[in-house]
Amino acid sequence: MKRLLSLPPNVVACFHDITNTKRSDFFCTSDPVERKLGSGGGTAWLLEACHRDERPDENFEQWLKRDKRILLHAGGQSRRLPAYAPSGKVLTPVPVFRWERGQRIDQTLLNLQMPLYENMLRRAPESLRTLVASGDVYIRTTEALQDIPEADVVCYGLWGDPVQASHHGVFMMDRRKPGELDFMLQKPSTDEQARLMQTHYALMDIGVWLLSDRAVMALMKKSYKEEVGKGDIDFYDLYSQFGCALGRHPSQPDEELAGLSVAILPLEGGEFYHFGTIPEMVSSSVAIQNLVKDQRYIIQKGIKRQSSVFTQNAVIANRPTLHNTSVWIENSFLGKGWHLSSRNIVTGVPENSWQVALKSGICVDVVPVGETGYALRPYGYTDAFRGAVSDEATHFLEQPVGQWMEKRGVVAADLENSADLQAAKLFPVTDNLEEMERLLHWFVDDNPSEETTTLWRSLPRFSADDLCVEANLRRLVKMRRQMQNKTLPVLAKNWQKSVFYQVNLKDMAGKFAENNLVLPKDLSADAPLMTRIHNAMFRSEALARRDDVQSKAEEAKAFSLLREGITAEALRHKCQPHMTTCADQIVWARSAARIDLAGGWTDTPPYSLLFGGNVVNIAIEMNGQPPLQVYVKPSSEPVVICRSIDLGAMERIETFEELKQYDKVGSPFSIPKAALSLAGFLPGFGAETYTSLRQQLEAFGCGIEITLLSAIPTGSGLGTSSILAATVLGALSDFCGLGWDKNEICYRTLVLEQMLTTGGGWQDQYGGVLNGVKLLQTVPGFDQNATARWMPDSMFSVPELKPCHLLYYTGVTRTAKHILAEIVRGMFLNNTRHLALLGDMKRHAMDMYEALQLNDFNRYGHLVRRTWNQNKALDSGTNPPVIEALCQRIDDYCLGYKLPGAGGGGFMYMVAKDPAAALRIREELTSHPLSPNARFVEMKISETGLQVSRS
């Protein structure tokens, strides 16, 4: 997927440097300075520029087929957003949302925009390869994206009231065919909308369009004066010209576009925020911050005195008061002498000792110019920077510009170009901070000094247009980073009232390490446990480059604190085991394996503790039997004897010390040792105290023999270790009279895995212990008892579909512990990429739930494929070359397939397109197996899950 940006010319030259992005990730260009192209012509220009840059010798249509592309139009003069005009609207710094985790402390509008557009393009049919969007809006959605239909043009829209719609393009859809465009209107009046409402739905255009190659070529032909790729591009508007020519009954018919098919999609749960002007930047930020009012979901616990005050990368001596409203301070130093009121935007102000009192509506921007100079640009909160200086309607500093000039003895000739305020040379350049303070007072005071007018005339001056060209963006970004370095330790110190521990801590740790910033100290025991965990892992990440030993110690502390949180509840409730069997009785427990279909990983702490998890999985029997079995029987000698049938191993446990050795990974009997501890046979877990294990077993009435059978190869991906642990706990619960139900057994399995230090989530044990096909869900918090919702299993059992479900053992194995540790570390650090992927997985589980409820086999298969793609995106090791080779062999015959569990090997679950395709797969893989041990295993939905019985 390629990202193409249309930016202001000055930004193009240094974009990759100032954003720390790779040229391979973003292609940047700007529209020609000498002429306007419109959104349609600009799209053609951007595509052609990228084509010339990448493969100039290749035919344009062939080049178009190579990749999916996001085109973001982010050029323009930004007249009404002076604070960020030099760097472009898309690089506007946006404050971290107080209710969100994983955002970067220095995130920009571009960082927020891209994930949704990337998700849309990923979900689009292969024929839709080009997405066009605007750079001055932030669009978010609270619901999963719906399926995107095949069409030449697919447009997203939002429902809005008629007044809102009168300021936008509007898609009109016949009520009898609501998914198709009938025609498009630009800014229709409320009266016109009222007339059409009887027969049509009206959906506001949000400027996100997906185009097929056919539609792109049609747009290119309309944009070029001659043939595509030759001659100049004309002005052509994507929305008012191209858009209005589309539909069944277009408002502006065009024969050349009549054959294009169009689909309109409401963006369900969609929200639309403008960042194109100063007032919009502030109002949108306020609206976003206040989206979540439920205090349980607001991470930042401090209460701001004024919700419309935003400070970023700024050193501020005077704390904002209740009287400060609509204030934005960024990349600035405001000492004791600075006093703000309302509607003040302050950006780029270097360290100073000025005495400044800004009236309402007065804003200050300082722009680095050259190597040492600064351009001072005061302006008004609502200034449009449009119109002739002689026009009374043209305002500057929220007053008629003529009035402002008259007070200062400034004449039109001083400005050089007075036909347009944007081109007027108003803003002086100096490297003298004392001069700059005098000039600032001269710009904004009611009684400006004549002497300063002389100073103003004597200095080189730039217009707003000039500043977009002359700004030294590398200096600007360097200053921003220096300001940030001063504020980050303060954020960390004031963590209780700041966003520090909710941001992307991997990114934050990099900033601390690169700039040798003082790390925050260990948090005290009275701090929230999850915050202490974040603190330890943050310190580990920041120390990784300079002190590996200390880094590993901090990481171990984070995992230890996590274990403490999960096991605390189990330790509070002590067990009292007592013998409930006859001397010759055997307790026999057996469980199914599980295949996770969607949402795997969202059950893993700490993600599930922070967000709750959604997982859809199935319990399966293999080759006609439950594959995981445990036998427990009394022993006449007061010791514990563990046996494994499949491993051919045995161990005799006679002391508490031997029982404690459960956390050694690789030990064949770690699970029964930990299970016995949880059942009350280790001090700290039992209700009564004994001096030795032998004494406790004598009091219990017998020794214990535990025999394990796992009829599944190691590293299968079917949840073997977790389900075996649950099966042992189920057997011991019955044998020792503990009375645990299936839910308690699954919860204690989560605790057991933390004791083993293997980590892991809860879906494996719930998947095998609970029967059938189910959606499993938990809510945020350390109590991770899952709620199960069962679905029909007919898709897996009816004769025409049962053969389509194939389970194939690949013979390739991979241990999950190291995979888990890496991804869990990303969860601890609020890694932006990890959290975004996990959020998608969680929503995807609900799509899978719906498909199973609807018994939609075709959709189910495609959703299994999407699950596999999500797993690969989260962990590249999920799909090693040998597995990818297998995927290539079966792909044409499958709707979807995936490796259950963490991936990398084990079993492959396949959903064949039909029984004939399933037969072809069996023939192919039986004739040419992937490895010597590779084989098909018969799978059947388990109707019982965990069963426990006695002889």
Walk through the language-model features, giving the residues of each.
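N-terminal glycine-rich phosphate-binding loop and ensuing alpha1 helix
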Residues: M1-R129, A133, Y138-Q146, W404-M405
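Left-handed beta-helix
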Residues: K2-L7, E34-E58, V137-Y138, V153-V154, ...
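Stable alpha-helical structural segments in soluble proteins, enriched in small hydrophobic residues
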Residues: L46, Q113, K557-A558, L562-G565, ...
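Conserved core of the sugar-phosphate nucleotidyltransferase
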Residues: L64-R66, A85-G88, T92-V228
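Short beta-strand segments
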Residues: L71-A74, L131-S134, Y156-W159, S212, ...
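Short helix/loop capping segments that flank catalytic or ligand/cofactor-binding pockets
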Residues: R80-P82, T141-T142, Q164-S166, E192-R195, ...
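DPxDG-like acidic metal-binding loop motif
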Residues: S87, S716-L738, Y909
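C-terminal nucleotide
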Residues: H441, D445-E698, C746-G759, Q765-L899, ...
